[in-house]
Structure formats: structure tokens, C-alpha cells
Swiss-Prot record:
Organism of derivation: Phenylobacterium zucineum (strain HLK1)
Coarse class of the protein's main subcellular location: cytoplasm
Origin organism lineage: Bacteria, Pseudomonadati, Pseudomonadota, Alphaproteobacteria, Caulobacterales
Record has Cytoplasm as a keyword: yes
Gene Ontology CC annotations of this record: cytoplasm
Domain of life: Bacteria
2,3-didehydroalanine (Ser): modified positions: 143
Protein name in UniProt: Histidine ammonia-lyase
Gene giving rise to this polypeptide: hutH
E.C. no: 4.3.1.3
Cross-link (5-imidazolinone (Ala-Gly)): 142-144
Alphabetic keyword roster: Cytoplasm, Histidine metabolism, Lyase
Length: 511
């Protein structure tokens, strides 16, 4: 995989998607000069002897405590070590790696006051696959993601653990083995590494990219379920959706039409079909999936801005680019409310994609609704067929309904009420990978059920696109002619979905 050259402040969503998938990262060399200017500005600001938050003062409620020049380096080290107070299971290394790339892009914009050596160490750690072990719990999404980013920063100091080559090693040992020296922090640098929304944003982007893959996959399984139930494609007619003018709905309807185009199964019941209208789970796919697509795109836009932004505090404006005056401005860019809202939107979309998919599975196993054998087995009674896979799908969907509760409506005061309103973005973003894992199971079960339903229509075949999907599944999972151990079938279908084999690139996506 080719390395991505990261242009701070100008990276499209596709860049973050490729980094999430494991692409290498190199910083645009032009960024180093901008970083150096920012660090020099911090030196000049300190020389003025003025109190500047986080540079020569305490933090949070202790911001009024002035720190002597001789203690400035100790101040930053103490900040990192004291804030590395996360708990819980380690975050997925792909998420931590993405977080590191986001932090690299933020620091490289020259508004954080760090030295080039600090940026270079972070860049080299990504390049050499030195990924800090970061506990998942401990951030409330303001002031930034302090605890998770502190664990990243601590690893740069040689404290904590680093995962590399499948091993967890003491951070100092891992750095030494890679030929890297632990960082000795300069003024402002500890705060610059800790302050920011990169943990929440990385988790939210990971959830978004997984949701995009599963959205596309669910369009395919939804079309296949429509075929299995001998549903109509009339509700997907372009004229219906043009009148409503909802962009996602228009695109979802077009995708369903194209997926079903040329189906012999559909042609077999164009006339003399007693059903005037299909159940909502078939008929309203464009409306539900289109709304989900629109919400995912809105979240993607928000996260795209956040990924390219600077969420540090205070921000350094170097005199070279600021009318000759060096300034350190305190603000609130660390507040992750935009990320929290985006994560909540993604959660709602993921929940609804699974909800309507489970309803299609339930319809397929019910002979009164689908016209297919009960529970999709040739000999119901002797065999239970898809009875319990549908229950599993229902369980996964119900779990996602609980997980979809908005995180952004919660807040709790911290730091002796100095930080009295927080976003809970980390909570909202962290749950997304659990939700998409649940959705993956639902989509996999629908793939199995829909393919099984189509088997009963032989020798009639579906469209060329959907027959390719069935053929791919049948390479790993034979048709269910009698009961067998079902878990391996679901696992095999999940592997197909996870590999993105249903997420055709010409289907609608977030960007």
C-alpha cells in the first residue's frame, strides 16, 4: 500500500479512510517550517514574562498558579504522566494509529507551538508501527480527549506500553529497539499533545467507514431479499423519488433498481401478482436507506472538518503570519460537541439499517408473508432452518437500539467545575465499532436468508449482479437442505461482508 502524503488542513475523507485501512503516512515536508515558526513564537512569548495558560501556568482549575521558568519542562512532563489515567480495555490499534495521524496533522498546522522534533517522533512512530497502548475509557470529550492522548504522549516519553510486531513492550524498550530516543518535552508540548479531539474523531471516523461499508452491503442484501420474497421493484421507480427530492432516497432507489435489473425472478411475477403492495421492509427501502445515507454524509462532513482542524488550546499565532505579533489565544476548540453530534447521527443510521434488515429476515422466514417454506427449510418441523438466526438478528438489533441512545445530551462537570460542560464525544464514538459489528452480523444473516430464499425459485435466476453475490456465498456456504451447525455459516457470511465483497464501489457512499 502506497504511503499517504499528509497535507495538514487539506486531507479529504478518502485519506483518513486509507489510513484507517493501514496506509502509511508521511507528512508534507513543507509543514516542518511552519511547525518551527510556531515553536519559535512560544519562545518569544515566554521571553515577555507574561502568564500564558498551559505554558507557564497550571492547568484547569489550577490555571492561576504561575510556574517558574526552571520548572516549565517538568510542568509538561507532569501533565502527561498525571493525565495518563485511562482505564478499560485497550483501544483497537487501528483506531490509535488513526488518532496519531490526526494529531500529527493538527500539530503540523503550526498553531500548537511544538518543535519539529516532536512532530518527527510522532511521524516516525506511525511509520515504524510503534502504536501506544491506549485504554478506551477516561475521556468526556472536553477538554479534548485528555486521558487517551496522554497515554499516546506518555509512550513518546518512554512511559507506558507500545504494541509493535504483535507484541506489547515497555515504551522505552520499544523506542530504543526502533532507534528512537524518548522525547524530552519543551514548553507547551505536553499540553499540545494532550489537548484535542483526535481520540473521539478517530473512533467516529472508524465507525463511519464501517457504517459506509455496511450501508452498501445492506443495499445488496435488501435487493436480494426483495427477489427472494418476489417483491416488486415498482416502489423503486425513479419518478416516485424525484417528487420527494430527498437526495439519499433518490440514490438508494437507483441502486436497488440497478441491482435488480434483468432479473428473471422479477419477470416471472410482473403480471397476475395478487399482492398489490409489499411490506414496508421491502417497499420503503429507498426511504429508510436514503435517510441513513443522508445522515451518514452529514456526519462525514462534520468529521472531515474536524479531522482537518486544530482543536488545541491555547492556540499559537506566530508573528511571521500574524502582523508581526506573537500571540497565544485561549479558546475552546477542544470541546468535541461536533464530533459527539456526528457520532450520535452515525449510531442512529447504523441502528436503522439493521432494524429494517432484520424485518426483512423476519418476513422471509414467515410463509404467510414471503410465500416461501417456513423458516426457509424444505422440511419444516423436522428442521428448524432459519428460526434461530432470525432470533440472533433480533438480538443484535435490540442491542443496537440500546447503544443508539444519544451520548451528546449528557454532560457532567469536571475539574472542580472549571470544565462544567462536556460533550461525551468519546462515549458516542467508541460504541460505533460495537454497533457496526452487530450490524455486520445482521447483514450476514440476511445474506444467508435471502440467498436461501432465492434457491427455492430455481431454475429462475436473479439479476447478474445478485447472482454473482449468490455464487460468491455458495463457494463458502452451501444451500441449507437440512439442519446443520449454523454458526460456521454465519461466520463465513460475516467474513464475506467484512471483506467488503458486497460493498460494490459504484453503490452510494459517504464521499
Amino acid at each position: 500500500m502506497t504511503d499517504i502524503v499528509l497535507e495538514p488542513g487539506a486531507a479529504p475523507l478518502s485519506v483518513w479512510r486509507e489510513i484507517w485501512r493501514g496506509a502509511g503516512v508521511r507528512l508534507d515536508p513543507a509543514a516542518h517550517a511552519v511547525v518551527a515558526q510556531s515553536a519559535e513564537a512560544v519562545t518569544r512569548i515566554l521571553a515577555r514574562g507574561e502568564p500564558v495558560y498551559g505554558i507557564n501556568t497550571g492547568f484547569g482549575k489550577l490555571a492561576t498558579v504561575r510556574i517558574e521558568d526552571a520548572d516549565l519542562a517538568t510542568l509538561q512532563r507532569n501533565l502527561v504522566l498525571s493525565h495518563a489515567a485511562g482505564v478499560g480495555e485497550a483501544s483497537p490499534r487501528a483506531v490509535v494509529r488513526l488518532m496519531m495521524a490526526l494529531k500529527l496533522a493538527s500539530l503540523a498546522q503550526g498553531a500548537s507551538g511544538v518543535r519539529p522534533v516532536t512532530v518527527q517522533l510522532l511521524e516516525r512512530m506511525i511509520a515504524q508501527d510503534l502504536i501506544p497502548v491506549v485504554p478506551g475509557q477516561g475521556s468526556v470529550g472536553a477538554s479534548g480527549d485528555l486521558a487517551p492522548l496522554a497515554h499516546m504522549a506518555a509512550a513518546m516519553l518512554g512511559v507506558g506500553e507500545i504494541e509493535t510486531a504483535g507484541q506489547r513492550l515497555p515504551a522505552g524498550e520499544a523506542l530504543a529497539a526502533a532507534g528512537l530516543a524518548p522525547l524530552a518535552l519543551g514548553p507547551k508540548e505536553g499540553l499540545a499533545l494532550l489537548n484535542g479531539t483526535q481520540f473521539s474523531t478517530a473512533n467516529a471516523l472508524a465507525g463511519l467507514f464501517e457504517a459506509e461499508r455496511l450501508f452498501r452491503s445492506a443495499l445488496v442484501t435488501g435487493a436480494l431479499s426483495t427477489e427472494a420474497a418476489k417483491g416488486s421493484d415498482t416502489p423503486f421507480d425513479a419518478r416516485i423519488h424525484a417528487l420527494r427530492r430527498q437526495p439519499g432516497q433518490v440514490e438508494a432507489a437507483r441502486a436497488l433498481r440497478e441491482l435488480m435489473a434483468g432479473s428473471a425472478i422479477r419477470a416471472s411475477h410482473l403480471k397476475d401478482d395478487e399482492r398489490v403492495q409489499d411490506p414496508y421492509c421491502l417497499r420503503c427501502q429507498p426511504q429508510v436507506m436514503g435517510a441513513a445515507l443522508d445522515v451518514l454524509r452529514q456526519a462525514a462532513a462534520t468529521l472531515g472538518f474536524e479531522a482537518n482542524g486544530v482543536s488545541d488550546n491555547p492556540l499559537i499565532f506566530a508573528g511571521d503570519t500574524n502582523n508581526g505579533e506573537d500571540e497565544a489565544l485561549s479558546g475552546g476548540n477542544f470541546h468535541a460537541e461536533p464530533v459527539a453530534f456526528a457520532a450520535d447521527m452515525i449510531a442512529l443510521a447504523v441502528c436503522e439499517i439493521g432494524s429494517i434488515a432484520e424485518r426483512r429476515i423476519a418476513m422471509l422466514v414467515d410463509p404467510a408473508l414471503s410465500g416461501l417454506p417456513a423458516f426457509l427449510t424444505p422440511k419444516p418441523g423436522l428442521n428448524s432452518g432459519f428460526m434461530i438466526p432470525q432470533v440472533t438478528a433480533a438480538a443484535l438489533v435490540s442491542e443496537n437500539k440500546q447503544l443508539a441512545h444519544p451520548a451528546s445530551v449528557d454532560s457532567i462537570p469536571t475539574s472542580a467545575n472549571q470544565e462544567d460542560h462536556v460533550s461525551m464525544a468519546a462515549h458516542g464514538a467508541r460504541r460505533l465499532l460495537a454497533m457496526t459489528a452487530n450490524l455486520e452480523g445482521v447483514v450476514a444473516i440476511e445474506l444467508l436468508a435471502a440467498a436461501q430464499g432465492c434457491d427455492f425459485h430455481a431454475p429462475l435466476t436473479s439479476s447478474e449482479a445478485l447472482e454473482r453475490v449468490r455464487a460468491r456465498l455458495r463457494r463458502d456456504v452451501p444451500s441449507l437442505d437440512h439442519d446443520r451447525h449454523f454458526a460456521p455459516d454465519i461466520a463465513a457470511a460475516q467474513a464475506i461482508v467484512r471483506a467488503g465483497e458486497l460493498a460494490f464501489p459504484d453503490l452510494p457512499g459517504v464521499a
